[in-house]
């Protein structure tokens, strides 16, 4: 086979020196190609399909196609009692079931206008923050493996297993907990709850720092995420972004601070946002940094809750749970800060039925994913993997 000669390159064309007849014009009007990613592609984190229109290796447009995991959540809610909806919320963002339950329960409690015991409030926050850390570990670990780093994935799932064991010990389930109930909890925590949770905090704090250094000081990981998929703050706000996605664009917005609920107003913690020293504000690396730093803040919250949680022997966590829930006629919107952003519920009651007339779930994953067109435009095809991973979607919540 004849060896190709060296190429002489300028801004508009590439010319092979050994054959003057061959001239490739880089600015030719070539035909676009349609590339389908998913719905079984590993980097889509579930049954998501992206239809990408490409010009060579450059993405012109990426359109998400949803609905493969649709399970009629909102329609089911109209046919079952208020307490029976709690297990259904677990199955939306199945990586953060405690947070889903908390958002739903505080919405119904707002409609019922009932007060929750302080011990219950502190327990709710502790399990929600444990679940937040577990969710972020999945996000960081799978993001690392998407970009070719296998070891951090193993580290993340090793540490997540400690949290899964704790939550199983508390609630009886590893994932779909059905633990936070309207007006209380399914069970009070075991006797040595404080000791075991405190031991986990002590164990995990140095691990969180190690994980932070493992990726943010990795040259390959930084090159794959730095200055990729930039979302300006004003565009992120217009899209309705929330959670680590919005904070990654430099907006210091966290419902635990800006619209506090439960006992969060009593707790001292920071809301991490990128400062532009290690990343371009709004890029994939910024979104990763926010999640990595948030785990330390969750540990601070858990420690404070352990100190402030009142000791009440023979405490009945179901004492204030109504036997039959039939709220007065009206409508209410409640929301909470989930690991992926704002999860909200809009509930309408007719005052007669034990089921809601309407239960609308506001999914942060769906809203964040809606910006995929803007995020991917002009990026290279391999960078789509980095962009999708930085959004950290769960298709169970996107489709519902």
UniProtKB/Swiss-Prot annotation:
NCBIfam families: PRK06075.1. Its EC number is 7.1.1.-. One of its GO terms (cellular component) is plasma membrane. Keywords: Cell inner membrane, Cell membrane, Membrane, NAD, Quinone, Translocase, Transport. It is a peripheral membrane protein. NDH-1 is composed of 14 different subunits. Subunits NuoB, C, D, E, F, and G constitute the peripheral sector of the complex. It catalyses: a quinone + NADH + 5 H(+)(in) = a quinol + NAD(+) + 4 H(+)(out). Gene3D superfamilies: Cytochrome-c3 Hydrogenase, chain B (1.10.645.10). It is found in: Cell inner membrane. The lineage of its organism: Bacteria, Pseudomonadati, Chlorobiota, Chlorobiia, Chlorobiales. Belongs to the complex I 49 kDa subunit family. NDH-1 shuttles electrons from NADH, via FMN and iron-sulfur (Fe-S) centers, to quinones in the respiratory chain. The immediate electron acceptor for the enzyme in this species is believed to be a menaquinone. Couples the redox reaction to proton translocation (for every two electrons transferred, four hydrogen ions are translocated across the cytoplasmic membrane), and thus conserves the redox energy in a proton gradient. One of its GO terms (molecular function) is quinone binding. This is NADH-quinone oxidoreductase subunit D. Pfam families: Complex1_49kDa. It is an enzyme of class 7 (translocase). It comes from the Bacteria.
């Amino acid at each position: 086979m004849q060896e190709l000669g060296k190429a002489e390159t300028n801004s508009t064309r590439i010319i092979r020196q050994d054959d003057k007849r061959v001239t490739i014009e880089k600015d030719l009007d070539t035909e676009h190609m349609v590339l389908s990613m998913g719905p079984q592609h590993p980097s889509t984190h579930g049954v998501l399909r992206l239809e990408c229109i490409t010009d060579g290796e450059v993405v012109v447009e990426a359109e998400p196609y949803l609905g493969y995991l649709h399970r009629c959540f909102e329609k089911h809610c109209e046919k079952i009692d208020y307490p029976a909806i709690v297990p259904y919320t677990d199955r939306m963002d199945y990586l953060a079931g405690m947070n889903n339950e908390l958002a739903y329960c505080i919405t119904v409690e707002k409609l019922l206008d009932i007060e929750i015991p302080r011990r219950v409030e502190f327990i709710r926050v502790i399990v929600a923050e444990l679940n937040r850390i577990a969710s972020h570990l999945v996000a960081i670990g799978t993001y690392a493996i998407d970009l070719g780093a296998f070891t951090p994935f193993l580290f993340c799932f090793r540490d997540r297993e400690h949290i899964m064991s704790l939550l199983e010990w508390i609630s009886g389930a590893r994932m779909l907990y059905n633990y936070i109930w309207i007006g209380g909890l399914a069970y009070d925590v075991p006797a040595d709850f404080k000791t075991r949770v405190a031991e986990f905090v002590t164990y995990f704090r140095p691990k969180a720092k190690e994980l932070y250094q493992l990726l943010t000081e990795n040259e390959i990981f930084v090159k794959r995420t730095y200055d990729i998929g930039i979302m300006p703050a004003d565009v992120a706000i217009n899209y309705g972004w929330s959670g680590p996605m919005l904070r990654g664009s430099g907006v210091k917005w966290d419902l635990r601070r800006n619209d506090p609920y439960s006992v969060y107003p009593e707790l001292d913690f920071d809301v991490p946002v990128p400062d532009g020293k290690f990343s371009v504000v709004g890029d994939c690396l910024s979104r990763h940094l926010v999640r990595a730093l948030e785990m330390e803040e969750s540990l601070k919250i858990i420690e404070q809750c352990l100190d402030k949680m009142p000791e009440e022997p023979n405490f009945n966590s179901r004492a204030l749970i109504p036997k039959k829930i039939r709220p007065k006629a009206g409508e209410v919107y409640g929301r909470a800060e989930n690991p992926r952003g704002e999860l909200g519920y809009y509930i309408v009651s007719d005052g007669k039925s034990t089921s809601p007339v309407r239960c609308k779930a506001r999914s942060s994953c769906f809203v964040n994913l809606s910006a995929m067109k803007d995020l991917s435009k002009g990026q290279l095809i391999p960078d789509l993997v980095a962009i999708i991973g930085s959004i950290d979607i769960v298709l169970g919540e996107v489709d519902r």
